[in-house]
């Protein structure tokens, strides 16, 4: 635990900090609300992230959580220019290795001098549960140093917060504690709350955290993801059904939520367009049973138009990622928020109804 793994010698430091610490006082916290633009259309439009907020990426196995996190590091961390901390908690060693080498290739990590602005902390799948339980707290402590000592706006990426809970469950079993629901540790809510309360914005700086959350068997009522829900400002839910349609990122536009989706924060235009998009998608969802039984021909002309627009909107929410260029062969795109709002506004107005569905993939 605490050893460098990149074969570049010992870490030279004079300052040490305990990984268990108290959350900041209420008086030191900042309450300003500001949107963090990611360049990912479906996120910025329908469930925007708050600067200094806690964001959860929910999804089952192989729906694209880690790829989305890597794209956020690529888009936000580079544009934002501040410090980033990545805590790899109980995930695949290969993914951690890939991320490290990609950061070197893209210049986020500079091996020649001290200009790098990212810290990587790993406790991968093969590590004992004690190491996996501590690595999330270690990453958080590093982020707190950048916020409190250097006054930075820090981005903290945790992949995967479920493994933090899982490691706590294993440690609890080794200690002989009586398990709670579904075999989790009896201190599940306390463990999660103690960590999450430290991730906040103070008057010195901010920590914006993006946490990938594995959902066991795609069950959002499982105690581990359900306990995490209470602490989040925004949730991005990745859907297997959308991934099966070949739409990536496979973000569910109806299940994903954000606390700052408020006209007083994002503005009336953004709010109205987002709610208009969600209304069409919800109407389409409610018509799907009728379509399955009776077919499209039995729908009214108005419903046919709703279905047509909804299918086009679904495809327009897709986007090629820069970090996935090697797999898809398509160049990644970063879309400004103004362009996103304008594009969907024109779609809702029917300006592009004459175009076929295929035209809506970027």
UniProtKB/Swiss-Prot annotation:
Modified residues (Phosphoserine): 286
Binding annotation for ATP: 62, 64-67
Source superkingdom: Eukaryota
Gene Ontology MF: a single term: ATP binding
Catalytic activity: ATP + H2O + 4 H(+)(in) = ADP + phosphate + 5 H(+)(out)
Recorded family membership: Belongs to the ATPase alpha/beta chains family.
Tagged with keyword Translocase: yes
Positions of post-translational Phosphothreonine modification: 165
Single biological process term from Gene Ontology: proton motive force-driven mitochondrial ATP synthesis
Residues given in the record as Mg(2+) 2 binding sites: 91
Residues at which ADP binds: 62-67
Binding, Mg(2+) 1: 66
Keywords: Acetylation, ATP synthesis, ATP-binding, CF(1), Hydrogen ion transport, Ion transport, Magnesium, Membrane, Metal-binding, Mitochondrion, Mitochondrion inner membrane, Nucleotide-binding, Phosphoprotein, Translocase, Transport
Modified residue annotations for N6-succinyllysine: 14, 112, 117
Sites bearing N6-acetyllysine, chain numbering: 14, 51, 112, 117, 279, 333, 338
Pfam families: ATP-synt_ab, ATP-synt_VA_C
Catalytic class of the enzyme: translocase
Record-linked InterPro entries: ATP-synt_VA_C, ATP_synth_F1_bsu, ATPase_a/bsu_AS, ATPase_alpha/beta_chains, ATPase_F1/V1/A1_a/bsu_nucl-bd, ATPase_F1/V1_b/a_C, P-loop_NTPase
Full protein name: ATP synthase F(1) complex catalytic subunit beta, mitochondrial
CDD domains linked to this entry: ATP-synt_F1_beta_C, F1-ATPase_beta_CD
Subcellular location: Mitochondrion inner membrane
